[in-house]
Amino acid sequence: MKLLPKILAHSIDHNQHIEESRQLLSYALIHPATSLEDRSALAMWLNHLEDRTSTSFGSQNRGRSDSVDYGQTHYYHQRQNSEDKLNGWQNSRDSGICISASNWQDKSLGCENGHVPLYSSSSVPATINTIGTSTSTILSGQAHHSPLKRSVSLTPPMNVPNQPLGHGWMSHEDLRARGPQCLPSDHAPLSPQSSVASSGSGGSEHLEDQTTARNTFQEEGSGMKDVPAWLKSLRLHKYAALFSQMTYEEMMALTECQLEAQNVTKGARHKIVISIQKLKERQNLLKSLERDIIEGGSLRIPLQELHQMILTPIKAYSSPSTTPEVRRREPLLMESPSPDCKDSAATVTSATASASAGASGGLQPPQLSSCDGELAVAPLPEGDLPGQFTRVMGKVCTQLLVSRPDEENISSYLQLLDKCLVHEAFTETQKKRLLSWKQQVQKLFRSFPRKTLLDISGYRQQRNRGFGQSNSLPTASSVGSGMGRRNPRQYQIASRNVPSARLGLLGTSGFVSSNQRHTAANPTIMKQGRQNLWFANPGGSNSVPSRTHSSVQKTRSLPVHTSPQNMLMFQQPEFQLPVTEPDINNRLESLCLSMTEHALGDGVDRTSTI
């Protein structure tokens, strides 16, 4: 460390090995064995303008005239910065640096003795850092230390396009040839994080490129808005930045070779290509769903497929052979407005009641109704995914209007309509048609009695739980505890929980004893339903079952003491399993009323066995 200052002083005084001395000094600054004091002393050779008149510079045999000249130059440089408010980048560089260069060339220690790169690199960082941070104040002597210390860990041979005259690493002929234009005009301004011998400008340019880059996810009508969610569902969302630079057509034409060129891993490449192939097959899938719906199949699977498809990227269809004006008129020509659909809504709704009453599951293929009659006139062109989607939605609407009401399907269809109405791929005509279908289905949904919907939900609960369980019937505690008050409403509410479509006759052990358990009637013994209903004898005799029955399935005969009058009462033909839904509801209410009357009658004449 004692030898290094002598070498540097000799190199500067004799203008020899300037570049090698600079590299040696930079290596010494970044060497881990260099102490903090040594680093501070070595840094003065490169950067401290204020300390030029100090003892360290005096020991290097520097002339006092250079210090005076530097002081005047530095003052002029600061004055120019303060007057211009640092708004003129070129002016601040020319006024501060080039004048100092011309003054230095006039002195005995001119540009040839190596002082230009040494001195200029000390004054410019303050100016550049001031511009980068958009401040109009001149940094003090202490403020000049921060860029110097940041530059300690950087390697010297790097090209520094952002460092004015600190490209003192350039040849002196280049400096003289540039004259008043000491810096090339294409240099980018330094960012606040940049420093001497830094390549930070590359990072800032990269950020600027990213901000100005195209992002198709945010473009209207690009069809790419749903790509991030689609990639996330495939667990490939880390490649979203790659897709954001593509158009819809480029994405659909992606190949494994193109993805490999973008450094996409093999597994992800394969998954992306397969997923794009599925996107290409969506129109054929919609045609297949349309055929299934027309043939009267279940709507649940098509609705699930449509829900998954609406989340994938879909672009509005535009015919390549037509002008934009014709494209706007084409939907109006192909799809006429649907006043017939609205006018015939009442007809379809009225036909729905009779159709629902006669339909029990398997449906005949429906005639083309007002919902999809217009859409089936002409085949849709290849690639018209929104049009094909709208056609399938019309088929689903027709099936919902003429088939047995299903709350889940209707709710799922309405949710799907809401997604379509806000999707950018559908035309205004298609959205008007979808809105018309939504109004029809909502009207049909509101026309159903709530009791029917409760029965349907009860039927689903019973189907999910299975048979032979006691969850769907009133428990002994709920019914037996209410018997003391003789509240008829309790029996009516309890009876409504019984599923209507799989109605078995009620086991009434709850009306007889609070210890006895209830189970639903098994379909295998529904023919013996008359044996599953036990009532207290209205005639007044104390007819109690001879033993406690834990399960209805174990009971294949009536209790011993059941009277013949009870048997005759349940042998009426009206108590057979009804066929239609309204009859089920009416007869279920009649059964509940009959049960309530018997229970209240036993309580009045005090002959009840409960």
Curated annotation (Swiss-Prot):
Q: Which family does it belong to?
A: Belongs to the SMAUG family.
What protein does this entry describe?
Protein Smaug homolog 1
* Known role: Acts as a translational repressor of SRE-containing messengers.
Family annotation (SMART domains)? SAM
| Protein's UniProt keywords contain Phosphoprotein | yes
Which residues in this protein are found as Omega-N-methylarginine? 465
Q: Which residues form the signal peptide?
A: none
Compartments, record wording: Cytoplasm; Cell projection, Dendrite; Synapse, Synaptosome
Record the organism: Rattus norvegicus (Rat)
GO terms for MF = mRNA binding; translation repressor activity
**Segments forming domain SAM:** 222-295
Q: Mind naming one GO cellular-component term on file for this protein?
A: P-body
The segments labelled Disordered in the record are: 177-222, 318-366, 464-487
Low complexity bias spans: 344-358
Give a single Pfam family match. SAM_1
Q: Which CDD domains match?
A: SAM_Smaug
GO process terms (BP)? nuclear-transcribed mRNA poly(A) tail shortening; positive regulation of translation; regulation of postsynapse assembly
Q: Where is the composition biased (Polar residues)?
A: 467-480
> Any idea which residues bear Phosphoserine here?
67, 319, 472
* Entry-linked InterPro entries: PHAT_dom_sf, SAM, SAM/pointed_sf, SMAUG/VTS1_RNA-bind, Smaug_SAM
- According to the UniProt record, list the residues that bear Phosphothreonine: 323
Organ and tissue specificity = Expressed in brain (at protein level).
Q: Which keywords belong to this entry?
A: Cell projection, Cytoplasm, Methylation, Phosphoprotein, Repressor, Synapse, Synaptosome, Translation regulation
Where primarily located? cytoplasm
